[in-house]
Swiss-Prot record:
Residues 4-120 form the Response regulatory domain. This is Probable transcriptional regulator ycf29. Keywords: Chloroplast, DNA-binding, Phosphoprotein, Plastid, Transcription, Transcription regulation, Two-component regulatory system. GO terms for cellular component: chloroplast. GO terms for biological process: regulation of DNA-templated transcription. Its main location: plastid. It is found in: Plastid, Chloroplast. Coiled coil: none annotated. SUPFAM superfamilies: C-terminal effector domain of the bipartite response regulators (SSF46894), CheY-like (SSF52172). It holds the Pfam family GerE. The lineage of its organism: Eukaryota, Rhodophyta, Bangiophyceae, Bangiales, Bangiaceae. InterPro entries: CheY-like_superfamily (IPR011006), Sig_transdc_resp-reg_C-effctor (IPR016032), Sig_transdc_resp-reg_receiver (IPR001789), Tscrpt_reg_LuxR_C (IPR000792), WH-like_DNA-bd_sf (IPR036388).
């Protein structure tokens, strides 16, 4: 089983180095450069583990962990802190908040791998993965219900068409298309068209033909 990890680190060089190391170990690794970006990614993908720095702009690591714990769909994702905040009081705060590991920089990547493998051996990642999948399916079954018209417009949005182009194809007004796009954003809880497209592809909201084209190379126009 290939586990899906998110690395939250605002040091671009360090994040790339860690990503390459973990990919070599067989993991799928996504990168977020701050806590806010991490939250947006967490809502889109079912991560098995999050490795996060603490000192970051917008949303710091402690705040990120607190927000994850408050969300039923994300609360079981284990978090490992990887940070320069190495004081005992900082480590205690992290563990009290529910982190599964705390590594101080500079660190040995083999120690990080050991912590991850320990979580795998204890089935912590498997439990998080199953919980994420169940929650995701439940959300799709009970919350994301699209009308035929919404599905038609969503397919065209994923194809990269503008509202004007969609209105021409469907023989309706631009304002009416805008209304449906706004409704789709609301139903999926996405902030813009790009995130809507990614969410739709990842959660199979499209028909098979559109999904195959999208996976070949998604293009969107804001």
């Amino acid at each position: 089983m290939s586990y899906k990890l998110m690395l939250v680190e605002n040091d671009i060089v360090l994040s790339k180095a860690i990503q390459e190391y973990l990919i070599d170990q067989g993991f799928n690794v996504y990168i977020a450069n701050n806590g806010l970006e991490a939250l947006n990614l967490a809502y889109q993908y079912n991560f098995d583990l999050i490795i996060s720095d603490i000192m970051m702009p917008l949303v710091n690591g402690y705040e990120l962990l607190a927000k994850l714990k408050k969300n039923k769909a994300l609360s079981k994702i284990p978090v490992i802190f990887l940070t320069a905040k190495g004081m005992t009081k900082d480590r205690i705060k992290g563990y009290d908040m529910g982190c599964y590991g705390y590594l101080s920089k500079p660190f040995d990547p083999n120690e990080l791998l050991s912590i991850i493998n320990n979580l795998i051996a204890r089935d912590v990642l498997k439990e998080a993965s199953l919980q994420n999948s169940a929650t995701s399916n439940q959300q799709l079954n009970h919350k994301i219900r699209l009308t035929p018209r919404e599905k038609s417009i969503l397919d065209l949005v994923v194809d990269g068409l503008t509202n004007k182009e969609i209105s021409t194809i469907l023989n309706t007004s631009v304002r009416n298309v805008e209304k449906y796009v706004s409704r789709l954003l609301h139903k999926t809880n996405m902030k813009n068209r790009t995130l809507l497209v990614k969410y739709s592809i990842n959660n199979n909201l499209l028909n098979n033909e559109i999904n195959e084209r999208a996976n070949d190379g998604t293009r969107t126009r804001e």
